[in-house]
């Protein structure tokens, strides 16, 4: 079962609606996030889902406010307090290797150069946790010329174009369905095939 859902992002006005904050954009739009009662705890914003949504057990939401590179500090604080194992944790994060708006549920795997995932792996001592990846796509640097270094950091820290936000938010109904099924699932692995790659309804 998933007992802790972590939405990765950077804290502060300057990072609102940036690509690296795709998980926060989604969180603020979906049912479980928009209806949550958030409080400052575990070095981030924390909420417990109402018992009506998770009968017989507690499920926790977390938005680390440590900045992306130190996300693990917030995750380990919550995981230790609630005595959770890595396999009970879902990390929701932006993903360069997926086209904008695509949602992809997976178990374990590489870090893809994502500093938030790297920090979490460091504190959990394993990469064996569930992920919901949100596609932000790779930028086209062809206009920079062959000698230019691709500015990936600048890309992920820049704001979504409105068209990209529209595509992401078109996934809210799908994301709501995913989280509903996830909260009801005794074995999250059974959902991987269905939710391995969910295309946006508009692009």
UniProtKB/Swiss-Prot annotation:
SUPFAM superfamilies: Peptidyl-tRNA hydrolase-like. It is found in: Cytoplasm. Keywords: Cytoplasm, Hydrolase, RNA-binding, tRNA-binding. TRNA binds at residues 15, 67, 69, 115. The record marks 94 as: Stabilizes the basic form of H active site to accept a proton. The active site is at residue 20. Gene3D superfamilies: Peptidyl-tRNA hydrolase. GO terms for cellular component: cytoplasm. It comes from the Bacteria. It catalyses: an N-acyl-L-alpha-aminoacyl-tRNA + H2O = an N-acyl-L-amino acid + a tRNA + H(+). GO terms for biological process: protein quality control for misfolded or incompletely synthesized proteins; rescue of stalled ribosome. The record marks 10 as: Discriminates between blocked and unblocked aminoacyl-tRNA. It is an enzyme of class 3 (hydrolase). GO terms for molecular function: peptidyl-tRNA hydrolase activity; tRNA binding. HAMAP family: Pept_tRNA_hydro_bact (MF_00083). Hydrolyzes ribosome-free peptidyl-tRNAs (with 1 or more amino acids incorporated), which drop off the ribosome during protein synthesis, or as a result of ribosome stalling. Catalyzes the release of premature peptidyl moieties from peptidyl-tRNA molecules trapped in stalled 50S ribosomal subunits, and thus maintains levels of free tRNAs and 50S ribosomes. Monomer. PANTHER family: PEPTIDYL-TRNA HYDROLASE. Belongs to the PTH family. This is Peptidyl-tRNA hydrolase. The lineage of its organism: Bacteria, Pseudomonadati, Spirochaetota, Spirochaetia, Spirochaetales.
């Amino acid at each position: 079962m998933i007992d802790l859902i972590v939405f990765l992002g950077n804290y502060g006005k300057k990072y609102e609606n940036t690509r690296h904050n795709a998980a926060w954009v989604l969180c603020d739009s979906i049912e479980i996030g928009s209806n949550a009662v958030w409080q400052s705890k575990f070095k981030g914003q924390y909420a417990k889902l109402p018992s009506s949504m998770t009968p017989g057990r507690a499920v926790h939401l977390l938005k680390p406010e440590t900045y992306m590179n130190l996300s693990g500090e917030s995750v380990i604080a919550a995981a230790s307090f609630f005595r959770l194992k890595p396999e009970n944790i879902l990390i929701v994060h932006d993903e360069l290797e997926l086209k904008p708006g695509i949602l992809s549920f997976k178990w374990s795997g590489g870090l893809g150069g994502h500093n938030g995932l790297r920090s979490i792996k460091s504190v959990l001592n394993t990469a064996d946790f569930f992920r919901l990846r949100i596609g932000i796509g790779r930028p086209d640097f062809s206009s920079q010329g062959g000698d230019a270094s691709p500015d990936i950091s600048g890309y992920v820290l820049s704001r979504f174009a409105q068209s990209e936000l529209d595509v992401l938010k078109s996934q809210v109904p799908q994301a709501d369905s995913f989280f509903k099924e996830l909260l009801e699932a005794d074995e999250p692995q059974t959902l991987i095939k269905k939710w391995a790659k969910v295309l946006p309804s508009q692009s």
